[in-house]
Each structure stands twice: as structure tokens, then as C-alpha cells.
Amino acid sequence: MGSPRSALSCLLLHLLVLCLQAQEGPGRGPALGRELASLFRAGREPQGVSQQHVREQSLVTDQLSRRLIRTYQLYSRTSGKHVQVLANKRINAMAEDGDPFAKLIVETDTFGSRVRVRGAETGLYICMNKKGKLIAKSNGKGKDCVFTEIVLENNYTALQNAKYEGWYMAFTRKGRPRKGSKTRQHQREVHFMKRLPRGHHTTEQSLRFEFLNYPPFTRSLRGSQRTWAPEPR
């Protein structure tokens, strides 16, 4: 069923058509009705079109916008340690806090929540092959190297592969990668927490508010106009 607002809009449109038909005569009435109907539909299209555009653009790589780059560690809920990308292209969740191989650079792929993750020390991207195994690649342009960040109700983050929907980045209690085909969003193995590397300070933390001292103001009346004048010191 349509909303009351839509029904009211249609009723008003019909009334307007009838009024114009009465003024313009029988020959002009139907044409006016068609023109008004097209205008009415055009006024309702932009919202749906914009929503469709957002959905379509969130599924493809954004080549126009400036990419947001973040640096942090991924703390594994099951292993109790951090995800690392080693020089031998192995990926596990066995790194201690502050380990240089646990420092990850996360690049946004779209204006949505899709990202590419690479090791800051090795420059290798975390990807997933057709068997659901996590692999490291020097070229992360493929869709298999794109993950969708999903913030869960427990405040943990899950990373779902963009190419293999329903397959997640996951690690066992021993920090070994788990095949994406055996993962589900509710499993602890796919839950991660973002943490800043040890000793890393964000720009926001280094900023301090600066307050400017202005003399106090009092209100005075000059004739019929109100002005502001500083208090005498």
C-alpha cells in the first residue's frame, strides 16, 4: 500500500488536472494531464536513482575520489594476538603488540566500507584465493584483495571478501588462517578489533585547543539602536 502522503499527492494532482481541463477546454486537457504526470514522476525519481547509484558505486573500485589511508593493527579475538604479513608471504595472527609485521596499512577501495589491507613492512596485500585460503600478493588491484568491513553488535569487526561473498578473514586459536569457505559471521574466528600500534600517536591526540582571550562585552543603548561596547578595564 502507498503512503498517505503519496495518496494525497495523487489526489491533488488529479484535482489540478481537472481544473486545467475546465479552463483550457476539452482538446488541451489530456495533454496537460500527461505533462503534469510526467513532472510528478520526475519529481519522485531522483531519490530512487541516487540510492541505486550509491549501491552500484559501492560495488566497484572508486577511481575518482581521494583514498583514505589508515594504519592500525588487527587484534584477533581467538588467538589473542595480531594479524601479520611476513616477508615469506605467510599470513597469521601470532604477532605481539608493536611487532613491525603487524602494522597494517588499510586503503579505502570505495566510498563505502570496502578496503584493501597490506603489511606496512612488506607491502604485500592480504588476498583470498578460490579455495578460501589467505594469500599475500604484491599487486592488490584484484577484487580478491578487497574486503568489506562489517561492524558487529559486539563492537568487533569482520572482514568479508568482496569476490567471494560470505567468506571471511579468519584465524584459529593458534593464529593459523582458516579457510573462508568454513567461516560464518557469528564465529569468533572472524572477529577482530582495530588497535593502534604501540607508541603510535594519532594527529588528533597531538592537537590541543587554543583559546583566544577577548575583552568582555557589555550592552549599551544609543538612541533606538543596540550596540556592543567593551567594558572599561
From Swiss-Prot:
The keyword Transferase does not apply. Belongs to the heparin-binding growth factors family. It is found in: Secreted. Residues 1-22 form the signal peptide. This is Fibroblast growth factor 8. One of its GO terms (molecular function) is growth factor activity. Keywords: Developmental protein, Differentiation, Disease variant, Glycoprotein, Growth factor, Hypogonadotropic hypogonadism, Kallmann syndrome, Mitogen, Secreted, Signal. The gene is FGF8. Changing H14N: In HH6; phenotype consistent with normosmic idiopathic hypogonadotropic hypogonadism. The keyword Glycoprotein applies. It comes from Homo sapiens (Human). One of its GO terms (cellular component) is external side of plasma membrane. Its main location: secreted. Plays an important role in the regulation of embryonic development, cell proliferation, cell differentiation and cell migration. Required for normal brain, eye, ear and limb development during embryogenesis. Required for normal development of the gonadotropin-releasing hormone (GnRH) neuronal system. Plays a role in neurite outgrowth in hippocampal cells. It comes from the Eukaryota. Pfam families: FGF. SMART domains: FGF. Coiled coil: none annotated. Monomer. Homodimer. Interacts with FGFR1, FGFR2, FGFR3 and FGFR4. Affinity between fibroblast growth factors (FGFs) and their receptors is increased by heparan sulfate glycosaminoglycans that function as coreceptors. GO terms for biological process: anatomical structure morphogenesis; aorta morphogenesis; blood vessel remodeling; bone development; branching involved in blood vessel morphogenesis; branching involved in salivary gland morphogenesis; branching involved in ureteric bud morphogenesis; cell fate commitment. It is linked to Hypogonadotropic hypogonadism 6 with or without anosmia: A disorder characterized by absent or incomplete sexual maturation by the age of 18 years, in conjunction with low levels of circulating gonadotropins and testosterone and no other abnormalities of the hypothalamic-pituitary axis. In some cases, it is associated with non-reproductive phenotypes, such as anosmia, cleft palate, and sensorineural hearing loss. Anosmia or hyposmia is related to the absence or hypoplasia of the olfactory bulbs and tracts. Hypoplastic femurs and pelvis: An autosomal dominant disorder characterized by isolated bilateral hypoplasia of the femoral and pelvic bones.
